[in-house]
A protein has these predicted regions:
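Polysaccharide-binding surfaces and accessory modules of carbohydrate-active proteins
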Residues: 24-35, 43-245
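Bacterial N-terminal signal peptides that target proteins for export
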Residues: 1-11
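Bacterial N-terminal signal peptides
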Residues: 9-19
Length: 246
């Protein structure tokens, strides 16, 4: 069994390319760097996203004490926050503990793909996390592929296309909502503690109600001509749910 879900993530002024340094995966643009900790046999973690790092910075980033977070958190042994993936194995166990099997990079047209394969420590259950970095646009495409080789079906209780931690601060969310003949209404709101959910269960008619696109303003209320933003959009139609946990 396999499942593939996909999301486009637009990092304002962000064009992602991939390179490996030691146990870290560095996905860089001309102006920014995204660093993931990816030791084989260890947990995939998000280390840094911000201004582009030099080679010296990359060599010393593990010495800075920069806090890291799971890059694709699963429900299991330690899950204080929202999980990207939660399953129920055939024997009733609901625990996952994923470790990195391998990291691969490849090129596809004008894009570079970083593929990180994860496997549960006990069960033959696998997750591949992909980052596809386009070279001619400030966009990366990220998605997950889920598969297993267990003898009986595995129930997927929750499975996300992607997960992105954002540092807390004066962060605002912009998104579109509406109804028939009143589509595309803009909502801008400060992120408060708790869970924000944007969802649509209207099949392919997503433009009528809540849209599957969001933008995070990282430095306060959105402005027309200035600011640091991260945008994300699902690249398929249909029912969806975007969860923002603060």
């Amino acid at each position: 069994m396999s499942i593939r879900k996909r999301m486009n993530v637009l990092f304002g002024t962000l064009l992602l390319t991939g390179s490996l340094f030691s146990q870290n995966v560095c996905v860089s643009t001309p102006e920014t760097s995204l660093v993931l900790s990816a030791p084989v046999g260890g947990e995939l973690k998000h280390v840094y996203y911000g201004d582009k790092l030099s080679e010296v910075d990359l060599q010393n980033i593990n010495l800075t004490g920069t806090p890291d977070m799971p890059a694709y958190p699963v429900y299991g042994l330690n899950c204080p926050g929202e999980s990207a993936l939660a399953v129920k194995h055939a024997d009733g166990n609901m625990t996952l503990q994923m470790e990195i099997v391998q990291v691969k990079t490849s090129k596809e047209g004008n894009a570079e793909i970083t593929a990180i394969e994860l496997k549960d420590k006990v069960y033959p259950f696998y997750v591949n996390v992909y980052y596809k970095a386009y070279q001619d646009a400030d966009v990366i495409e990220t998605w997950t592929e889920i598969r297993h080789q267990e003898k009986k079906p595995v129930i997927l209780n929750q499975f996300a296309s992607a997960f992105l931690p954002i540092r807390r601060g004066d962060v605002w969310l912009s998104h579109l909502y509406g109804s028939w003949a009143n589509e595309g209404r803009l909502c801008q709101e400060a992120l408060e503690p708790g869970m924000k959910v944007i969802k649509n269960k209207d099949g392919v008619r997503n433009s009528h109600t809540s849209h599957a696109e969001v933008m995070f303003s990282l430095d306060g209320k959105p402005q027309e001509n200035a600011g640091c933003v991260i945008g994300a959009a699902l690249c398929y139609s249909g029912n969806y749910k975007l969860r923002i946990d603060t």
